[in-house]
Structures are given as C-alpha cells and as structure tokens.
Amino acid sequence: MDQGLSTGAHQDTDGLRERNTRVDSTVGREALTAVGEGEIKDKDGKASKTFGRTPDGTVFTVPQTHDMVSQLLLPSEPKNFGDLVVLILLAGHIMFLWALPAGAKIPIFAVTYLFWRLAYNAGIGWLLHNQSHHKTLIRWAEKTKVFVNPATGENPHPKLYNWIKRELETKIPQDYSFDNAPIEYNTWLVFRRLVDLILMCDFTSYCLFAIACGHQPVDESILMTVLRWSAGIVLVLFNLWVKLDAHRVVKDYAWYWGDFFYLIDQELTFDGVFEMAPHPMYSVGYAGYYGISLMAASYKVLFISIIAHAAQFAFLVLVENPHIDKTYNPPPPRKRSSTCADSSSTLPTDLDTPTAPTPSEDQTPNATYSYSVKPPQPVHNLLGLHNLDLYRTTDSSIMLVQLLVFSITALTPSTPWYQLLFVVLAAISRIWYSVGIGYILRNQSNTKSWTRHFVKYGDTPQEAWNQWKGTYHLSMILCYSSFIAAVWKMYTFPADWGYGLVLFRHVLGAGLISLQIWTSVSIYESLGEFGWFYGDFFFDDSPKLTYNGIYRFLNNPERVLGLAGVWGAVLITSSGAVTFLALLSHILSLAFIQFVERPHMQKLYGRSLRQDAGLVKSLKRSLPPSLKQLHGSVDKMFDDSFEFIEEMLDNARPKLAAGVNTFVKDTTALFQKYPARVTIARIDADLAGFDVRDYALSVEGTSALSFEESEKNKGREGANARMPLDRRGDLKDLTFEYGSPIRVKWTAPLHHSKKDWIGLYRVTDNTSREVTRVSSQGRWVATNEGAYDNLTCEKGILTSDVVIPSSERQGQDPCEFASGEIVFAGDKLFWTQGVFELRYHHNGMHNVMAISRPFEIRIRRSDEDETISDGDSFVESAVENALLPVVRNCFDRDPEIAPETVDEQFGTLVERDGKFAKRVVFAVHQMFGIELAAEVVKADGNVRNLAWRICNAKKVLAPYSMSRSNGTTTPLEESKE
C-alpha cells in the first residue's frame, strides 16, 4: 500500500548534506508503478487507457476502480454480496459494543482489534510475502481452476466461478471482462475484497475500542480539555488528508499492492504527501491514531496505537521493502569487456584495491604508497555493532571510554557535586564535538590542513582519512556517552506513574529518542560511511549531488529530527540542567551546519545546491501569499544574523589563533621536559503399494581430487593399506568441487506421488535410513513442478516423469518407470566441506524411499612448495588459476556476477549480497590458510587482485609458516667452517 520509495520520480540536483554518495544505477519503485487505474489525460484532454503487464508479458487494459470507502458507503456505487458482508460485520461490531456490559467492553474490543491488526500485518503480510517470492495466490488460482470458464469442462467449481464473475463485474461495469482478464488481475481483484474486509474491520474495531476507553480525566481544566480535543481533531484531519492525498497519487493499484501481481506500463511523477515524508502511509499516515488517543484521554488507546504502528513498520520492513528492492532495484547488468586486454586496462588502481604490481615495483620499499585523491574502497567500516573490531585501536578505545564513563556513572552517588561534574563533562564533550571538530573540518575545507599534516610525515591521504574517521567516531561516542551519563545522574525514578503527565512525558520522550535513532540510521543509509564522516572534505572526486532516502524530504534532517532524542531526555527528566545541555547541543549543531557544512557545500557544489527540500516545497505550496512573504523576511533576518556572527568570528580569529598556538607550544615543551609513558517425523499412511526397490538416486558433479589421492603414500598406514583401492564403476569415489552444481538422476514408479521431493543432508545428520528427522533447511527440490505453492523448491528441476521403457530396467521386474533430473546449486548446497547424501522422500512427507551414495565436497589445499618460485616470489598465475573456478562456483556460475577471466570484474550483486563474498572467504582460508574479511573480496573486485592480495599475505606470513619451504621449524646453529 505504501509507495514510500516512489516519491522521487524526478530528483533535484541540489541540496545540502548529501555528501557525494555513490550513485546507484538502478531505479526505484517509481520507475514502473503507481497510479495504474487512474484516469490519465492525453494531449487532447481525453481519458487515455492504462495498460498492465503480467509476468509472462501479457498486456491488458486496466479498468478504473474506486476506493473501498466510496464503494461501501456511497449509494451511487453499485453494491454486491461482498459489500453487504462487510457492512453487516461493521454493524455487528457496533451492536456488540452497545450490548456488552461496561466492564467487558475494553478487554473484548482490545482483543478484537488486535485480532484484526494481526490479520492485517501477519495474515495479509504472509499472503503478500509468498505471492512476491512464490506467486502463491496465482498458483492457488491455477490449481483450483476457479477462473477457468466452465464451458471448457475443466472448472470443477462452476457455481463459484459464476458467483465471483457476478461479484467482480458488478463492481467494475466498464472496460472489464472477467473471462478475458488475465488470471493475475482477477486474483488481485479477489484479494482486494479480502483486504477491504480486514482493513474496514481493523479501523472500526480501533475506533470502537477508543470509544470504550474514552473518558474525561478527573480535575482536568476546561482549557486542557479544549487543547486536547483540538490537537486530536487536527491530527485526525491531517491523517485524513494524508490518506486521501496518497490515494490520489497512487490510486487503487498501489493501495492494494497491485505490483505483487502485475505491473503498470507507465511512469508518473509523485507529489503531494509523497514529497513530505518517507513511506507517508505508514509514518505520518498514523498521526490520527495518536489524535484519537488524545481525544479518548486513555493510555490504553495510546499503547495499543503504538503497538499497531510498530506492527505496521514491521510489515513495511519484512514484506514491502524486500518486494520493492526485488522488483524495482535489481542489480544493473554487468559491463563485460570485449577482450581480456580491455578488461585489464580498466582495473582499479586504488591503494586498497591493488593491481598486482610488477616484481620491480614490489621490491621497492614505498612502492605501495599512493597519493591518489580518490576515496578508498570501504572495506572495514566503523559504524555498527557488526563492524566492532577490538583489534582496531579506535574500537578498543571507544569500548574503554564507554566502560569508564558508565562505570563512574554507576558507582558514584547522584549528589549535586557529581551531577554538576557530569553536566560539565557533557557540555565540554558537546563543545568539542561541534566546535573542535568543526574547526578541524573548516581548516580541512580551506587548506587541507589535516591531510597536509599526515603527508608531511610521509603518510598518505588515505591514512589521514582513516585517522580522521577514528577521531570523529571517538568524539561522537564520547559526546553522547557523557550526555547519557548526565541524564542518568539527573533522572529521578517517579514515585507515582499515574500522577499528572509523568507517564505521558516518558512515552513522548521515548518516542523522540526513537525518532532520533531512526533519523541517524536513515542518514547513514543515505550517505554511507563516506558521507557520514564528511568524506568530501578530504577527497574531491567528481562531486555530484544525489538525493535519496531521507534527503528527498529534508535538506538537513540532523537540524531538527537528528536532535529529537536530546529533547526526549528533557521530557523524561524534567531537569533544567538537561534542558541546558539540549539547548547547547541544538545551538552548536545549527552553528556547525551554518559555519562548517554550508560554506563547504556551497564551495564544492555551487549553484547545484537545492534551496528547498520536498517537505518545504509542499508546505510553501499550501501557504497563503502573506505567509510566504513572511517566510522570506524571516529567512533574510536569519541570514543577516549569521553573517554578522561570522564577521565577528573572522575578526577575532587572529587573536584566538595566536593564543591557541602559544598554548600548544607551551604544552608541547612541557611534555618534552616531563615525558610520561525437534524434529517431528511425519509418517505417511499411504505407503502401501510402493516398493522402495523401485526408487533410485544417482549423483553426478564436477570431480575434485579426493582425500585418498591427495594423502596417499604418506607412509602412515600399515604395509597392507598403502596401496590404493581398486575403485571402478559404482565403487569409484564421489568427490566434488566446493560449490559446483550437483546433478541428480532419480527413478520412481509411474504412479509415484507428484509431491515427492529430494533433500540434501550430511551423512551424519540422520541415524534412521527410513525416516528423515532433520530439517533440510531449504536444501530440497521437488520432483515435479506445480506440486507445491513455492517457486523456490522448483528451482533446479530439469526433467520430470520421463517414461523409461521396461527394456532398460535390468535385473528387475520388466515394467516402465518414471525418471527425472534435478540440479542442486547455489543456496541449495552446503557451503562447507564434508560428506553428504541425497534422500528421496514420499508425498511431501519425510518417509525415505531412496538414498544416494555418499559423496564428498572438498577444497584442495594449495601446496606452498608449488606456489613458490625462485627468490621466494609467489607465482600469482598459479593462484589465479586455482582461484578462478572456485570463485565461479562461489558465485553460482551466474553469468551476471561470476567472472569468465581473472581480470573480469565481479557483478554488482556481490556487493549487495554478502553471502557470495563469505563463500570465497571460506574457500581462500581452506585453500591457502589466509583468513580475509568479506569486505576485502568485494573491494578487490576481480580474481587477479584477490590473488595478488593472497600472495602478498603469504609473503608477509611466510616467516611464521611451518612448511618445509621455509626451512626447518627450529633454528639450528650454523656449522663453523
């Protein structure tokens, strides 16, 4: 329903803090969506047709439809049986509220509302998730043949067919034919009726619950009552406008998740509410819930509103966003070079992405130093718990600082002196974070002082950038840690939560804190690590502004929303000291934007800066002319004030600089003078008539060097065991390459169940040979298509039910049998080494009908002696040749991402989905004993760079290796001549 990512159908090219982010070549949901069945006027002013396109390419005319409220409540709209059912249910809810005793109304309607909310977010969410991934609703319609004309004799439900046809054609009298419409569109129309029922009951039960909880608080003044009702009505009206405007923009097509079923051949501009906020249907579109909570004056309504809102965000994150990314943001097609030479000529030359230097370069001590002004590849990010690395000085320092701050906070009493101490510490940390960091960035912008300092001592700009990131990150953590400590010291646990507005203040404060956290996450998602740490102050690399994420709607989200949490702390503590800290933080943040960010952005991007963001544009359009003029006067006043302050600071800068230089010199001299150092087995009951001897599995794959072949002649076995076994025919070892597809041939009786399936397991997973008791964890493939409401289980089916004549059935009863082939690849494999088997299961259950021969998945470990040549120089070509087939297997041999040559770049999906890089990391560790991070594989970008990195890592670690190539493991005294 929400089209949050569709709001930027046309993007501006100007703005403030969108810092030179990498531009994604893919398009958002706005490229092919929205507004399907709305009337679109052509150049002659006539209504033009809207065309839909099904996944199989069928093009059809999308008729115009109307929203559910109009269809239900307007007498002019045609009604059908489904409308009557919805109206009767709504009337039943109202009568139920009237009939219940006073003490039972609140709990019963709370349960009723939660039921409908669960049906919305969990029920509809489950249907949409499966429709997106497996086309489940379409497959149900195809299986039941409910949309097939009974005249063909194939529809087993002719009465149901006629009833659905009458219902749908009654609602859509024009441009619609039930018999001619594609099955996707008819399925969507039926799905709409279910959505209408759930949404109407959801909203009605919520309003009735609010009525049941509504009351007049004791001793509430008339003024407070008027303010409460006025604010509530304003929020409800705003919510109503958001819904109506959103429906005006996206129409029924997006309102009812039409793109889960088909797409619209149309690209339109999104405006109105979609310029104001991200995902307006799920964010500001729930403002009315809080307005109703105010009018009801009930914390019960408020808390259930928060639960509903949180469930809606979960629906967005788990259902809608994955579908949006899959449908509208696929990875761009990879750029293939015509020749290897062309490919090699475009290799990156960044420091963090080496290009296999020549031996002469490699022997030069400083050959790897590069003073490139290009930003380094993001390999080892700082932000996020998943990036925490205690081996890194910055991370360990941050952990120690936080441990120290919070330990002192917890172990000291909350006396006035300690409270003052923590408030002063928080104020100093904030001043350093805004003023100190701002001073460094301003000088970096003007004179590159930070980078020059490191270059002066022989370091690279990349080293300066890394040191800056650590400094900024530590300053930010110290600022917020000290603020939290000060808030904790000033906070007093309420003696009575029901007194006055205590509970309301805590709820609102927690909401503001959550808003700041969400804003920070959104900013980081939009800017990335490079923009978060102000990378364009350090690297001037073809600056180009892009506006995505939260920056579509706000130029500087950190100006207001980014500090909502500090004001939330003010509400929770009701402390003057915390209010002072919040005010100080806000003033310093605004000054930082005005005196540091804005001048740099104007210098870097010039006239391309955007004056008004989407939210401001929407508000300006709705303002009367007099208020627009007032807005311009206020802006001029603020600009004049900031110019005066800036001139004053410019005049005072020489004196301040002289004082700071004197202080630094004195301090440096002082330090130089005084240095200081269950699994449930589902047994099928209909096994009668099936003989397990009629089932068989055979396995084929890309052979690899077996363990026995690689370890023979080591002299560890007894004399009789040193000769290799004579393995021929069916006794030959099955050892396959890591990640290579496994082809399975199966045979079964002709009357075998169409729901049979084959799963992949470790040999040690199951002790029983008759029943599988361990989950396959998605590593299974159905033997026949269409047997399951799941597309994933059909990936890998090559052939099914190929009849094999009895003449080919040697040594068994002469009768025909069915056979087929499937392939296990990609996510259906175990991405590790070990011994595995395949199991054929009966009728969707876990009864085992056949088990394949065990086979081994193995990665051959590289012999160091084979990869070392004269002068202890690793032969990179050997490493490249060993890596290339493994990397191709790790990338599922997908031509869009798997390289054909060592110079060809990896596909963009490798950067999006971390599983591919992690597979390569495991293989490299097993082959060469080198442990790399997944980010390194992404940054290297091709096999040649990865091989170069492995060879250099081997050289660095060679002195610590225990291999024979590095001499004896225990140094011996050289014999004297």
Swiss-Prot record:
It is a multi-pass membrane protein. Its EC number is 2.1.1.17. It holds the Pfam family PEMT. Residues 105-107, 215-221, 297-298, 419, 493-506, 597-977 are cytoplasmic. Gene3D superfamilies: 2.60.40.2840. Residues 1-83, 129-193, 243-275, 320-397, 441-469, 528-575 are lumenal. One of its GO terms (molecular function) is phosphatidylethanolamine N-methyltransferase activity. It comes from the Eukaryota. The keyword Lipid biosynthesis applies. Residues 1-10, 361-370 have a biased composition (Polar residues). PROSITE patterns: SAM_CHO2 (PS51598). The keyword Membrane applies. Keywords: Endoplasmic reticulum, Lipid biosynthesis, Lipid metabolism, Membrane, Methyltransferase, Phospholipid biosynthesis, Phospholipid metabolism, S-adenosyl-L-methionine, Transferase, Transmembrane, Transmembrane helix. Catalyzes the first step of the methylation pathway of phosphatidylcholine biosynthesis, the SAM-dependent methylation of phosphatidylethanolamine (PE) to phosphatidylmonomethylethanolamine (PMME). Belongs to the class VI-like SAM-binding methyltransferase superfamily. CHO2 family. This is Phosphatidylethanolamine N-methyltransferase. The lineage of its organism: Eukaryota, Fungi, Dikarya, Ascomycota, Pezizomycotina.
